[in-house]
């Protein structure tokens, strides 16, 4: 039986070669075997974010939001969680929620958090700020 760390490492390796469904399977299995106790909260948040991010890459925004919202519950100040959650909300036409989360990410990291992301997200937050 693989450990949580082994499953997460395997998931990351699969992501690097574009095998998103396989990576998702690894991350979900890791989440299943991670205890739901305070001692494992950081690990659970990391895995929830990995699942949400993978689903985002697969353009499964609604499913991604489910996992990212769970991660957000534990770590609402995390800029990356706010970024991904806001992106998914924007893609799902949840504009007010998207504005809140993208703005939190932007306020924490500035425009650098949007580097490597589709330019439409930075443009969206700038547009949303003006309105």
Language-model segments: which ranges?
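Alpha-helical linker/edge segments of TPR/alpha-solenoid repeat scaffolds
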Residues: 50-60, 91-101, 123-131
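TPR/TPR-like (Sel1-like) alpha-helical repeat modules
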Residues: 27-32, 89-113
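Alpha-helical adaptor scaffolds
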Residues: 16, 20-21, 28-74
């Amino acid at each position: 039986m693989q450990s949580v760390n082994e499953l997460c490492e395997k998931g990351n390796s699969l992501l690097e070669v574009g095998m998103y469904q396989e990576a998702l399977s690894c991350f979900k299995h890791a989440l299943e075997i991670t205890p739901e106790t305070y001692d494992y909260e950081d690990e659970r948040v990391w895995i929830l974010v990995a699942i949400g991010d993978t689903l985002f890459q697969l353009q499964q925004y609604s499913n991604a939001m489910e996992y990212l919202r769970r991660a957000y519950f534990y770590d609402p100040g995390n800029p990356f969680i706010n970024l991904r959650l806001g992106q998914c909300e924007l893609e799902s036409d949840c504009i007010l929620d998207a504005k809140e989360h993208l703005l939190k990410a932007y306020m924490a990291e500035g425009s650098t958090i949007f580097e490597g992301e589709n330019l439409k997200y930075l443009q969206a937050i700038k547009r949303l700020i003006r309105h």
